[in-house]
A protein has these predicted regions:
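Mobile active-site "lid"/loop adjacent to the S-adenosyl-L-methionine
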Residues: 150, 185-227, 243-250, 269
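Conserved class I S-adenosyl-L-methionine
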Residues: 114-122
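Class I S-adenosyl-L-methionine
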Residues: 184, 237-240, 244-348, 352-354
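Polybasic, low-complexity RNA-engagement segments
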Residues: 1-44, 300-468
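Helix-to-beta-strand junctions that scaffold the AdoMet/dcAdoMet cofactor pocket
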Residues: 137, 232-234
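Class I SAM-dependent transferase core
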Residues: 71-110, 155, 445-449
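S-adenosyl-L-methionine
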Residues: 147-181
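Conserved SAM-binding loop of SAM-dependent methyltransferases across substrates and taxa
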Residues: 125-138
């Protein structure tokens, strides 16, 4: 898509980068297509590799090509396929993410091996949160937040499909985290910005760009950081990132954090072949991606550590909440506390159960742990979250294998027939759970979440395959 760049942007890039690098950037933005990349989900285990390497029945197959060098299990694709029609995407087998933003992996690997409680502040649609959840210590709790309601629902969907139980999804503004004083070891703030990294993908981003908007974004970004800063522990780490190139929203804000909030910049070693500019810019024309800036900072130790006050969890009155069958506990593996919230059974990681009341007191929680089951009349119906979770004990439910066409019908929430016993059945595609049906014999009730269904009546057959 040809792009006409604003003259002020061209001048700014020449001043900031120099004439030759600025020309390479602008030529790439104006005359080349966006790259396409995905990350595989290792938490789905052997199923991911096995499923993605199976011979494909649909006519369109896209193979993974070159690896993204700064992120494990990440690959470029030669072109952008119709991801919607790949059942493996809906099963959480992989996530479509812009390659430059995967550089977050280097910060996680190098500095976050002992992180216990992590906040992704502006997390929708979920690219960085799924990456964090993959590479953080297995027992760490990740709070993935998004203030905008519609985007928060998308975030909750993507985190559910990724399937890790030590996750909590919230819908809050940055200021809501201020009372959670010194709760988080790491805060990732991929802040709203002027969107220069979207120029190749979105013509509106080009049309909306102006120096006035850049400076407004800078002010907003500083306000966001000041609001959330009290929630970061002394000595904790802040990942500050944008999808812009300009210094006002990038380096100038990093200097402001160090000067006004109290922090130091940490070094992230880079391979010279990656083409990373400075600390740390990914520029189209130099790196294979859409554009990204990231800086990792450590909060100064001078502020006395003040653990957040414990909150006593309210116990339901006798008879107020229904009991649930003990057998539900055997549906998942791992150490969990089992809770009943509004006719829903939740398995929450025991290692962070003491923190849960505090988080629920201050935050609007959309999803947490593993939603096991919902009470439907007198029947406990297994939840879709359970089907997606890596904690699910396979073999708990009868399973039915779906063909490609049957899988798409299921994902459209159409009627499907299964050769399985009556009752709740886990339907799969290439070994990957897609969700549940309730088999009634002559027919099966489709239990796929209505709001997540494929709405398109057309089909462009596609599955991802491995050739690396």
């Amino acid at each position: 898509m040809p792009v006409n760049l604003p003259s002020d942007f061209l001048s700014l890039m020449c001043q900031q980068l120099g004439e030759a690098p600025a020309k390479a950037l602008c030529d790439a933005l104006c005359s080349t297509e966006p790259s396409v990349s995905v990350r595989l989900n290792p938490w789905k285990g052997v199923e991911v590799r096995a499923a993605l390497s199976t011979a494909s029945s649909p006519s369109a197959v896209s193979s993974l090509s070159a690896p993204v060098p700064w992120c494990p299990d990440a690959y470029y694709l030669p072109e952008r396929p119709a991801f919607t029609f790949d059942p493996q995407l809906h099963a959480g087998a992989y996530y479509v993410q812009e390659a430059s933003s995967m550089f977050l992996a280097q910060a996680i690997i190098r500095y976050m091996s002992s992180a216990s409680v992590v906040l992704d502040l502006c997390a929708a649609p979920g690219g960085k949160s799924t990456l964090l959840r993959t590479l953080l210590p297995d027992g760490a709790l990740l709070v993935s937040n998004e203030p905008v309601a519609r985007r928060a629902q998308v975030l909750a969907e993507n985190m559910t499909k990724w399937g890790h139980p030590s996750t909590l999804v919230t819908q809050n503004f940055p200021a809501d985290f201020s009372p959670l004083r010194h709760v988080f070891d790491v805060i990732v703030a991929d802040v709203p910005c002027s969107g220069e990294g979207m120029f190749r993908k979105d013509a509106e981003a080009v049309g909306e760009w102006s120096m006035q908007n850049v400076l407004m974004c800078q002010e907003r970004q500083r306000s966001i950081l000041a609001d959330v800063w009290p929630a970061l522990k002394p000595g904790g780490q802040l990942v500050y990132s944008t999808c812009t190139f300009n210094r006002f929203e990038d380096e100038d804000n990093v200097d402001w954090i160090c000067r006004e909030l109290g922090a130091e910049v940490l070094d992230i070693p880079c391979n010279e072949a990656w083409g990373v500019t400075g600390h740390y810019h990914f520029l189209p024309g130099t790196t294979r991606g859409e554009g990204f800036f990231l800086s990792l900072l450590r909060k100064s130790d001078g502020e006395p550590l003040q653990p957040a006050a414990a909150v006593r969890e309210r116990r339901p009155k006798p008879g107020r909440e229904p009991a649930f069958p003990a057998a539900l506990r055997s549906w998942v593996r791992g150490e969990f506390d089992f809770l009943v919230e509004s006719d829903t059974v939740i398995a929450f990681p025991s290692s962070h159960a003491s923190l849960r009341p505090l988080l629920r007191r201050h935050l609007h929680v959309l999803a947490e742990g593993v939603c096991l089951a919902e009470l439907k009349g007198r029947d406990w119906q297994p939840a879709h979250s359970l089907a997606m979770s890596r904690a699910l004990v396979r073999g708990t439910f009868p399973e039915a294998v779906l063909t490609y066409d049957e899988a798409l019908a299921y994902l459209r929430r159409e009627a499907v027939s299964v050769a399985a016993p009556r009752g709740y059945v886990l339907v799969t595609f290439r070994g990957l759970p897609l969700g549940f049906v309730k088999n009634l014999g002559p027919r099966a009730n489709n239990l796929y979440p209505t709001e997540w269904r494929i709405r398109s009546g057309f089909t462009t057959p596609f599955v991802l395959s491995v050739s690396v």
